Amino acid sequence: KGFSYVRAEYPIAVKRFQIAIDQAKEYGIVGKNIFGTDFSFDIEIRLGAGAFVCGEDTALLESIEGKRGQPRVKPPYPANAGLWQKPTLINNVETYANIAQIILKGSEWYSSIGTETSKGTKVFALGGNVNNIGLVEVPMGTTLREIVFDIGGGIPNGREFKAAQTGGPSGGCIPKENLDVPIDYESLKQIGSMMGSGGLIVMDDTKCMVSLAKFYLQFTVSESCGKCNPCRIGTKRMLEILERITEGKGEEKDLEKLDKLAKNIIRASVCGLGQTAPNPVLSTTKYFMDEYKEHVIDKKCRTNECKKLAKITINPELCKGCGLCSI
């Protein structure tokens, strides 16, 4: 039996997938005695409550079983003891979607697409400061420049490309000097990011990278299941440091603390959520350290996104007394 785990917040996707399952049963592709054989296979949709941690394979299994979504300690691995302690094959639906094409066209056809180590195509959800947003499918090894400028149509309003964030909230930020890096699993890892489920957010030069790192860390702090101390407490301490920095209260030693905390959290966390949560911080401190130092030393945010670092000059002759400068 197969289970498709979908967030309850996606009712249209759930409805459409259920229609597809029902149609497959009508054609005898799914269900009992498929094509008149003694082989039976059913597919059931299970709805998740939206917890980010349930993207981790064993937390997802716990959720399907009706338990709280928390990762299991490995080993044993799902292939040996998965759903209800039975051997379980667990993959993203995008992986399974490739199987039919490989069977129909052969492994050589599939291997001809992509790079030496990352075969096939990848679907990206392209968004952010880019003219053409939406889902795009490209061969592995396509450069970030091709995706952003050739497919995405470039940056709106004549702004400059500053960075792209791949891999969702736990991914890293890629600066413009890496625009021509081929997008595959190995290359992204080498530059401090990850493929994840294919999120790709483009940012222009109006974005503050310190504020961005804080934004993503706020998400992972709130989504931590709390099972292990490094993730539950460590990410919270990192967020507190970033909050101080964006409020003009940061010190130079905070930058060293951030780096040390991040590496300890990666090393000691139980599951992938904690192991990847520091990525936005590590990648922005690696490529945009000048912005961090501006916040800490000069008490300045070049984009004025960090409102407590903004400096406002009031012209008494033009002031209308609206009070907006105090907000």
Model region roles, listed by residue range:
Residues V14-M140, G152:
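Hydrophobic alpha-helical positions that pack around
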Residues K15, I19-G36, D180-P316:
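Ferredoxin-type iron-sulfur electron-transfer modules in oxidoreductases and energy-metabolism complexes
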Residues K1, L144-I147, E160-F161, S224, ...:
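Extended, hydrophobic alpha-helical segments in both membrane/secreted and soluble proteins
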Residues G141-N157:
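Short amphipathic, charge-patterned alpha-helical segments
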Residues F3-I21, F41-I43, I155-I191, K286:
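Terminal amphipathic helices with adjacent charged low-complexity linkers/tails
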Residues R7-P11, L47-C54, Q85-N92, I133-V138, ...:
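Hydrophobic alpha-helical scaffolding
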